[in-house]
């Protein structure tokens, strides 16, 4: 029985092979399935590796389209405000039976610098690659940029790809403030999901469940520990982020050295994601998000 689900399995576009070689391998369906079978993974949720849409600061450049094929969902919603994002989300929940999205950190700067067509290319590419394996692969992301043009394009492309509007994915995740790790950030609180600015997103989640959506779960994508600690330090003490990464990394590494042999496999994303997710949930709890 293949009872495991793998999240954020990275893929890249073939024409960016050189640029992404040191980030992640290119995506190939057959080897992925062979590897998944070997380790008991029944379903993989794919995520385009950096550099990608989520690494493009300019909203126009990052604007993306939405495609859906059976259980395949590949979404890049560019949004500028939480309110605008919720409007488009609510529309698609009601119109297309859309029940989920993964919100990624998509307003940070990155090395790619391509236009909105790049996002379309990414979605089109992965949709074609996994079209014949809807029971084994899914792909989706939700970008936080300007929605005006993207909303209309997304809906049109979704209908083009999947006339029935049938999309099967669980309700996605909300990644916090590392979307804007830039020197000009002065108020980290406005970018965290326990802030009241995010309430309209959680309201959309509630409405989706009220529409008899089954398994409308929330998946949290925890921020990296280094970004969390470094940015908190920047806000509190006004230091440049680059100046404090070294000490923070050394501090973290010192504590990792004390991990038991049985826990050494947690070093890296597993440990940092656990830290980020716990901050999300505890922050939402003490700030009354679940109560509201």
Swiss-Prot record:
Q: In which pathway does it act?
A: Aromatic compound metabolism; benzoate degradation via hydroxylation
Keywords of this entry? Decarboxylase, Lyase
The reaction(s) catalysed by this protein are: 2,3-dihydroxybenzoate + H(+) = catechol + CO2
Q: What is its EC number?
A: 4.1.1.46
The Gene Ontology terms for molecular function here are: o-pyrocatechuate decarboxylase activity
* Catalytic residues (positions): 263
Gene Ontology biological process terms in this record:
benzoate catabolic process via hydroxylation
Q: What pairs make up the disulfide bonds? A: none
User: What InterPro entries does the record point to?
Assistant: Metal_Hydrolase
* Subunit-level organization: Homotetramer.
Miscellaneous section:
The MW of the complete protein is about 38 kDa (345 residues).
The name this protein carries in UniProt is 2,3-dihydroxybenzoate decarboxylase
Q: Which organism is it from?
A: Aspergillus niger
């Amino acid at each position: 029985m293949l009872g495991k689900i793998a999240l954020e399995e990275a893929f890249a576009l073939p024409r960016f092979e050189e640029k992404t070689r040191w980030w992640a391998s290119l995506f190939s369906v057959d080897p992925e399935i062979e590897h998944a079978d070997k380790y008991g993974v029944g379903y993989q949720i794919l995520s385009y590796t950096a550099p990608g849409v989520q690494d493009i600061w300019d909203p126009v450049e990052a604007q993306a389209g939405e495609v859906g094929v059976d259980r395949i969902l590949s979404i890049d919603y560019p949004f500028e405000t939480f309110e605008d994002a919720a409007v488009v989300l609510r529309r698609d929940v009601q119109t297309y039976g859309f029940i989920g999205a993964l919100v990624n950190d998509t307003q940070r700067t990155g090395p790619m610098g391509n236009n909105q067509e790049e996002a379309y290319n990414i979605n089109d590419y992965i949709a074609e690659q996994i079209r014949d394996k809807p029971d084994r692969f899914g792909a989706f992301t939700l970008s936080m940029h300007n929605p005006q043009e993207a909303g209309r394009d997304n809906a049109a492309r979704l209908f083009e790809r999947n006339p029935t509007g049938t999309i099967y994915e669980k309700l996605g995740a909300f990644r916090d403030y590392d979307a804007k790790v830039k020197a000009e950030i002065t108020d980290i609180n406005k970018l965290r999901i326990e802030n009241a600015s995010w309430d309209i997103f959680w309201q959309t989640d509630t409405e989706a469940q009220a529409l008899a959506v089954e398994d409308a779960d929330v998946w949290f994508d925890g921020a990296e520990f280094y970004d969390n600690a470094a940015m908190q330090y920047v806000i509190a003490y006004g230091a440049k982020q680059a100046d404090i990464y070294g000490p923070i990394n050394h501090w973290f590494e010192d504590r990792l050295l004390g991990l038991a042999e049985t826990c050494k496999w947690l070093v890296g994303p597993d440990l940092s994601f656990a830290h980020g997710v716990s901050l999300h949930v505890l922050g939402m709890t003490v700030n009354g998000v679940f109560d509201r």
